Amino acid sequence: MFKNKKIMIVVAHPDDEILGLGATMHRLINSYNVNTHLLILGEGITSRSDNRDLKKWNSELKIHKQNIMESKKLIGYHSISVNKLPDNRFDSLALLDLIKLIEKEKKKFKPDMVF
């Protein structure tokens, strides 16, 4: 069922790719030779303050980016797209814009399945 398939993983925040699917994806990559593309929608940190200020959280966002690259190596994800949608504020976005973002990645990667 999974052998040599293309799987796109869509997560809301950095670290969801580890907590939610990390072990499963690691197994599928190593045992079934799946090709993976990880799509992270949100930046994962600015909701810790009242106002969304990317400059204020710049050093933490850099650490997040390093952690994402480390998870790519550990799990074995083949490619990653990281977006900077507002953390825990997806409801402030037009649903169509969110769908278009996911569909654009899906069209580019052409997965057999999406998690």
Predicted features, each with a name:
Residues 109-115:
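Short N-terminal targeting/anchoring amphipathic segment
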Residues 1-109:
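Active-site rim/loop-helix segments in enzyme catalytic domains that contact anionic ligands
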